[in-house]
A protein has these predicted regions:
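N-terminal targeting leaders for non-cytosolic proteins
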Residues: 20-78
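Short beta-strands within extracellular/lumenal beta-sheet-rich domains
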Residues: 63-90, 104-107, 131-135, 154-157
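Extended extracellular/luminal ectodomain segments enriched in beta-structured repeat modules
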Residues: 88-96, 143
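Short beta-strand-plus-loop segments that form exposed binding edges in beta-rich domains
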Residues: 146-155
Length: 162
């Protein structure tokens, strides 16, 4: 019984240290998303005429050495209705997003509390001629959060909240 209790404590510890939300484009397949689609507890939400695309792309390397061969294209401005990524997060966790603008200019990825509609912050997506950016923000309260472009396209490669 003691061995089982010790195993249970270790198991709980491992799961409590794992990421609450994780989405890597490397785990996806090419697709045109026109509805709410779940990937291991994280949702990509598109709509007819306001779709999100997962597509193959030239390999891009992030500053930490992670290499991506696909990208999630938000395809333009998003909202609570479409063109967003949705995930659950807990107060105090850090949301980290690997991203880049689809244009030459820096673009803004809004992080919005789904329940209140409050924008908790903006993550900068570097211009497409730069390296993939890694932007992060601390989650202020338990809840569901939306990530969407405030203006024009942004490519997303990895979303992790831990």
């Amino acid at each position: 019984m003691k061995k089982f209790a010790l195993f249970f404590i270790v198991l709980v510890s491992v799961f409590s240290l794992s990421a609450e939300a994780f989405l890597s484009v490397n785990d996806l397949e090419s697709a045109k998303i026109v509805e709410r689609v779940e990937f291991d507890g994280v949702f990509i939400v598109g709509a007819e005429g306001k779709h999100v695309t997962v597509e193959e792309a030239d390999a891009k390397e992030a500053p930490d050495g992670e290499v991506f061969n696909l990208r999630i294209k938000l395809e333009g401005s998003g909202s609570a209705k479409h063109r967003h990524i949705e995930l659950n997060a807990k107060k105090g966790e850090t949301l980290k997003v690997y991203l880049i603008s689809s244009g030459e200019d820096v673009r803004n990825l809004a992080v919005v509390n789904k329940d209140t509609g409050a924008e908790i912050g903006v993550l900068d997506a570097p211009g497409k001629n730069d390296s993939i950016g890694i932007a992060s923000i601390e989650i202020p309260a338990d809840g569901t959060y939306l990530l969407y472009s405030k203006n024009k396209g942004i490519n997303i490669y990895l979303v992790i909240c831990e």
